[in-house]
């Protein structure tokens, strides 16, 4: 306000209110961002958003200056998607900061933002971010259609919007991706996806989302491809162990003992002797205890939660075996399942429910029950779509070109094209013949 009070042009001028408003806007205010607003509803919205509104008697409009909006969390290392090598900055609760973090990764004039307000009471700002010319325009139209149909009082977090716009609300699998790391969101936008940013949450939604994304880590692209491929294969194996290990143990120990080698069968029979519960009840009971410990570890403060998870699992497991309530083989199987499930945080929720389904069918139909649920699971996954994109691509429909970034991660110079199921206008993302071997051979010929 000091420049306004000391400026002699304002004291001596005979300008009308609107002309005085333009003079102040163009010559006096030193704020980085100033815009003129002529609608009272827009003025109220800017005030509630933390902006500074400048009104002059006799002027038909108002000047809005973007303020700090109060205290906010600084850019920190996100607790999810942790990496050993790679960027460590994460999104915050401020949408302006999150847009800036993405712009640092994508210094591209085609970077486009579309803004809308959702929530009758909360008036939450939502932005659709995409790269024009890379993303399919039909995808943006579909996102706008689904967002504009949301009529609710409040939007507090991205999970609200995710449940409104997902393709299969009754499915165990999420058809909308999310991340709190700018590098992940930028990489997905470069493949032809769109990002949905919501003010008040560090989690950014990305669509379309594929099943294969759950097995991909950002660190896979920052380390050498051989080790990245090995780790990715381990994640697939861990997922199968996480949903099938207890069920296979229940089926074999209850219905198919002939499949167990004789020495191992005698050992298992000795360990299970005197156990009052059938193996299916053991698996369900230990699974329930594991979920309780996992939930307690998440809700408690981090140092205390880790201690409760580790000590609680050791004490309860040892006590259950000593009391003769649970067999030691089942404790080993459940412990292996728990460790395997931690390798895929994105599928933790679906793994827990699938594990229970497999155990129940294994306890009634044996291996045939496991096969029945597994086939139903494959059919369900093949039927899912995410904003028109097959959820199982590039596996179904099969695309040999895109298999370079599924079970294994090929070198960057070999991944020339964007995903076939997602890319639209510009499928090629780099030039051919970027292999170091080709470059070295070409340099040798040049020297000769």
Model feature map: region roles:
Residues 1-244, 248, 258, 262, ...:
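Membrane-embedded alpha-helical signal segments
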